[in-house]
């Protein structure tokens, strides 16, 4: 019998926590089914000329079966995901992990089924996002004035950065990586794992641990494709995705300290904000938070405090 071919696409390097979790997912399925399935991880579609933004469409049209992708890409269909785009709302990472695997994850799973062709298999921890730049240490919003910053494909993020004083330029990660060395961007913001694994630290001396936003990635497949698999394969996909998600959350929890230990102090200056300095960024972005908070069900914020 011909094996069930399963392909998972991502946009990062092999050492990234996302691709390590994706590999774990494939290992679990292969261990259970052996030759009954074939599993292929296309860990970085950027290397085959595709932007990360193509991943969801690749799942929808059947080029691949699974992918992980920033939840920013799904917020227009699932407005509840905007909760994760708001500045400084995530304070307790463990509480958020519990929400991802609990009530909030269940809510997003339902909303994605209702509004998209996708099935949510897990919400992955993309980490606290921090500023890096090549110009000067950033300690206050005044230090951000006039700096061109690459942002994700999110107008809400752009609003936050404008509130800080940046000039945001939204581009896909593929274009960002290709241009980071060109000097187009003075600054960028990413979780430390991306800053390091994408090599940004080689071009940006200054790393400010701002934690201004928290990122999440949706691990998805196409609902129609999922329903085409035999019941035992569907069950194994669910259980393997759950285990891979738990593993991914664990990796994310310890990754920041590991990345900081790898940075060379002679090449990178890590700026730890004082409480007062952080408060200045919170104050600057408060109007953005207040404006968008009105658009969301107040009950959503309870997930961040559970």
Regions found by a protein language model. Name each.
Residues 1-95, 113-114, 118-306:
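N-terminal secretory/targeting leader peptides
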Residues 99-115:
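Hinge/lid segment of periplasmic solute-binding proteins
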């Amino acid at each position: 019998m011909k094996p069930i071919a399963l392909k998972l696409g991502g946009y990062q390097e092999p050492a990234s926590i996302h691709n390590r979790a994706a590999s774990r997912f494939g290992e679990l399925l292969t261990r259970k089914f052996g030759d009954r399935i074939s599993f292929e991880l296309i860990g970085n579609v950027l290397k085959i000329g595709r932007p990360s933004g193509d991943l969801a469409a690749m799942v929808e049209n059947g080029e691949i079966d699974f992918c992980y992708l920033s939840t920013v890409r799904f917020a227009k269909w699932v407005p509840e995901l905007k909760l994760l785009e708001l500045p400084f709302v995530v304070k307790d990472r463990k509480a958020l992990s519990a929400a991802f695997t609990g009530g909030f994850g269940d809510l997003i799973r339902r909303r994605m089924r209702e509004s998209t062709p996708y099935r949510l298999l897990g919400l992955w921890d993309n980490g606290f996002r921090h500023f890096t730049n090549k110009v000067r240490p950033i300690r206050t919003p005044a230090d951000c004035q006039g700096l061109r910053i690459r942002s994700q494909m999110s107008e809400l993020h752009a609003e936050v950065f404008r509130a800080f004083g940046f000039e945001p330029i939204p581009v896909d990660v593929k274009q960002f990586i290709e241009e980071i060395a060109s000097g187009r961007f003075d600054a960028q913001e990413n979780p430390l794992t991306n800053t390091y694994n994408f090599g940004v630290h080689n071009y940006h001396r200054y790393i400010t641990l701002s934690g201004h936003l928290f990122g999440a990635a949706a691990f998805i497949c196409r609902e129609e494709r999922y329903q085409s698999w035999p019941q035992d394969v569907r069950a194994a996909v669910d259980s393997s995705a759950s285990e891979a998600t738990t593993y991914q959350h664990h990796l994310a929890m310890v990754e920041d300290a590991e990345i900081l230990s790898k940075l060379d102090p002679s090449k990178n200056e890590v700026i730890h904000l004082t409480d007062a300095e952080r408060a200045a960024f919170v104050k600057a972005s408060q109007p953005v938070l207040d404006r968008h908070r009105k658009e969301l069900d107040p009950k959503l914020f309870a997930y961040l405090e559970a």
